[in-house]
């Protein structure tokens, strides 16, 4: 029975694009030779690591989705563990509803290179739109309500110094 798997691995940042391409092809070819089906590769590019791994700050991220019977996982992970180019890898088994294969097979080489999306920061408070005419501005000024009156003033509170100790004299002569 075939199951869906997802593997993400990180390659060393000092590799050239040709070497990254060779590593991706090496692992893709290994999967196809070992009866994995619908191998899809997504190249995420060079990204900053969340924390240093082997004194490295960056790495090339690659995601592979495939279907197989599970016998490909151990040899593939062994290849990655022995490789000097792979600094980290993780394989997970996907549920049936998580895996959605593409209708067409992926082309050779690095595919699905995402473009970084840079959105301008949104202002904390939206600025009012400028008035189109001066008449509207005059009307807007007239409709502005004055600020509400503050609540009744609070009366002054008397502070009491409680640091003094009140000591009552003790009668040491006791009559029994």
Curated annotation (Swiss-Prot):
| InterPro entries per UniProt | Ribosomal_bS6, Ribosomal_bS6_CS, Ribosomal_bS6_sf, Ribosomal_S6_plastid/chlpt, Transl_elong_EF1B/ribsomal_bS6
Where is region (Disordered) located?
Answer: 97-176
Q: Does the keyword Glycoprotein apply?
A: no
GO-annotated biological processes: translation
Keyword annotations from UniProtKB, A to Z: Ribonucleoprotein, Ribosomal protein, RNA-binding, rRNA-binding
One GO MF term on file is: small ribosomal subunit rRNA binding
Q: Where are the transmembrane segments?
A: none
PANTHER family from the UniProt entry? MITOCHONDRIAL 28S RIBOSOMAL PROTEIN S6, SMALL RIBOSOMAL SUBUNIT PROTEIN BS6M
Q: Give a short account of what the protein does.
A: Binds together with bS18 to 16S ribosomal RNA.
The family line of this record is: Belongs to the bacterial ribosomal protein bS6 family.
What NCBIfam families would the database entry show? S6
The identity of this protein, by name, is Small ribosomal subunit protein bS6
């Amino acid at each position: 029975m075939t199951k869906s798997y997802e593997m993400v691995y990180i390659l060393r940042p000092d590799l050239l694009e040709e070497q990254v391409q060779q590593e991706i092809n090496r692992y893709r070819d290994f999967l196809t030779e070992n009866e994995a089906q619908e191998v899809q590769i997504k190249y995420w590019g060079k990204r900053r690591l969340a924390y240093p791994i082997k004194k490295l700050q960056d790495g090339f991220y690659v995601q592979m989705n495939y279907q197989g019977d599970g016998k490909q996982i151990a040899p593939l992970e062994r290849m990655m563990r022995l490789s000097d180019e792979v600094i980290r890898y993780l394989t997970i088994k996907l549920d049936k509803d998580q895996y959605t294969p593409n209708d067409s097979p992926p082309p050779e080489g690095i595919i699905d290179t995402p473009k970084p999306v840079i959105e301008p920061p949104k202002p904390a408070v939206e600025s009012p739109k400028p008035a189109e005419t001066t008449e509207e501005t005059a009307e807007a000024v007239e409709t502005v309500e004055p600020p509400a009156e503050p609540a009744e003033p609070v009366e002054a509170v008397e502070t009491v110094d409680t640091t003094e100790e009140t000591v009552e004299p003790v009668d040491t002569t006791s009559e029994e």
